[in-house]
Structures are given as C-alpha cells and as structure tokens.
A protein has these predicted regions:
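Flexible, compositionally biased loop and terminal segments
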Residues: 1-201
C-alpha cells in the first residue's frame, strides 16, 4: 500500500502522483520475479528503512513502521500470486532491541496486531499458509509471545506455504549457537574432528 495522502502532502507530492510513484516502485521487483529464468521458491526480505522513511517524510516514526507493515501485506499478495512457497521476513534483530523503549513499544504493538490479524486473514487460510516465528522469544514481551502462539496454532496444520517472521533474531548469534553446539558434540565424543564439515555446520 502506498503511504496515506497526508504523507504525500507533507512531501510536497499530490496524492494521485504519490499513487503513481508508489505503483512504479512496486511494479519493478514484482516484474523482476516474474521474468526470472528460474522459478523463485524462497523470497526473503529485511524490514529496514521505516525510520529513515519517516524522518525524510517528516512524519512520526510509528507511522513509518505502520506504513512498512502495510507494505508487507502487499508483498504477501505477490508471494501468493507468484506461488512462492517460502516467504521470510526479518522484522526485528536482537540488535534492534537496544532502540528506545518508546519505539520498541510501538513495534511490539504492531507485531501483536499483525500476528493476530494474519491468524484470521482469509488469504492465509484459503492458501494454507503456515505461520512460524523464529528468534529468541524469551527476549520478547509476554503479550507478543501470546500473539505468536495464537498465529502459529491457528496455522499449524498448513503446509502449502510457509511464512516465517524473524523476531529478536540475529545471524551472528545463530552462528555462535551452531559453533557452541558443534563444540559440545565434539567434547562429548559424538562428533569427530574430521567429521566437522559444511554439513555439520
């Protein structure tokens, strides 16, 4: 979805011209996927730039995040339209948890709202989309975890599509955990040194 009329107005752009610009930006990645010589089976995106967009547009940071959430719904439509079975969104890294609490509260509220909405979304059930969340859930508030459980439980039986949301997730931490796990297996005598290869990692 394109930013609301007030956002375009604040940027000195008419609502109609804003719609044209938004559609032009949206059509490019969609066209690239459609014209790719090989079928795309996994689309992964990083939810980044909402704050910068808000600052440049001179709107509240919270509104920038909400516009980003709306854009995600558009991308989900693309995924279903193009029949891409795996869709992953990197929404919140562990590093992001150091942001001001006021901004985190806005994000957590959006996650709760989004997870509960998607659990009831007709598109999700009609297309049998399994929703799963990965990351360090112990770092998230209880109400966010409750929304995660709700969305996962409502879609647990589906397997046609998999929609993964990364919350409180960090790739560096994941690599560290993998290294620690391999070291523990080796120390216990369950994994010989010469057996540690790309497959083990």
């Amino acid at each position: 979805l394109n930013p609301p009329a007030q956002v375009w107005a604040d940027m000195g752009i008419s609502e109609r011209m804003g719609d044209v610009l938004g559609q032009a930006v949206e059509s490019k990645p969609l066209k690239e996927v459609q014209e790719h010589p090989e079928k795309v089976t996994h689309l992964a995106i990083i939810m980044d730039g909402n704050r910068r967009f808000a600052w440049k547009s001179k709107i509240a940071t919270g509104l920038g995040h909400r516009i980003g959430k709306q854009k995600l719904e558009t991308v989900l439509d693309w995924v279903l339209e193009l029949n891409i079975p795996w869709f992953t969104v990197y929404a919140l890294s562990t590093e992001n948890l150091t942001r001001p609490q006021e901004e985190l509260d806005i994000l957590f509220k959006l996650y709760i709202e989004g997870l509960r909405d998607i659990a009831e979304d007709e598109r999700i059930h009609a297309n049998e989309v399994k929703v799963q969340i990965i990351g360090r859930r112990e770092l998230l508030p209880e109400d966010v975890n409750e929304a995660i459980d709700y969305a996962e439980n409502k879609t647990a039986a589906y397997d046609k599509y998999v929609f993964t949301v990364c919350l409180a997730y960090g790739s560096r931490e994941e690599m560290l955990n993998a290294i620690q796990s391999i070291a523990a297996e080796h120390a216990a005598g369950d994994l010989p040194l010469d057996a540690i290869d790309e497959t083990a990692v």
